Amino acid sequence: VFIAAAFFPHLFTHYGQKEMFKAWLPSTAEHLLGTNSLGYDIYTELIYGTQETLLVGITSSAAALALGAVIGALSTLKGFAGAVFNGLINVFVLLPKLITLIVLASFAGGSVKDLIILIAAFSWVGAARSIRSKVIHLNAQPFIENCVIQGYSKAHIILRHILPNLYDVLMARFLLSINSCIMMESTLSFLGFGDLYHPTWGTMINFAYKRGAFIRGAYNYLLSPGVCIVLLSLAFYLISLYFEQRMKLISGR
């Protein structure tokens, strides 16, 4: 439903994104969640905010996964190089992620691109640790040792035997990362570091709080984006559990 709303918002609302009405209208058949202080339909704003929220979540998660996969794989190397990348993972594990993000976001431009870069830069550690653990496990398997004994090149072993066995862990980490990336974006946007020209659900909560929605009793304006954030995060989490279970079944064979 959320993905459909992101790609086909006109199927869910017949109002335009910037179509204005009387401010602070209550919930009615014409305006399901009422209108905000500027007269925008809150339900329509929620539908169009789905696209921006998913854009940040999926893009930053994909970037974090790519970075984490590379660093995680390189950390399994023997010698100095492997120790450096493993040390890098350990350093980022100890960093207070949210506080660091807030400090850096205060110096960034506040655009969607800046948010994606910042969130991705601090979301790769989980993927790196999972990939590192999986690669070490695979390297200890008899079929990998047989490939080495038979003289297959490292490229052949990686492409034909390592990468195919990483699919489930990559998908699980990707979906879990979307969950955390959406939460981080929502937190930063609520604190005022989001892009005002591309409002997400977090930005909606920020606007609602600043414009006195609570005082006016416009609880729909405050609660609806928060409920959507929770439901979307829960959906990605449940899908990630499926891939984690598959990974455990395959590892147990």
Question: Can you describe what each PLM-predicted range is?
Answer:
Residues 32, 36, 76-77, 81-137, ...:
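Generic hydrophobic transmembrane alpha-helix motif, especially the helices
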Residues 51-67, 155-187:
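Transmembrane alpha-helices
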Residues 17-60, 207-224:
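Periplasmic/extracellular loop-to-transmembrane helix junction in inner-membrane transport proteins
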Residues 106-108, 135, 184-224, 228:
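Glycine-rich helix-loop "coupling/hinge" segments at transmembrane-helix boundaries
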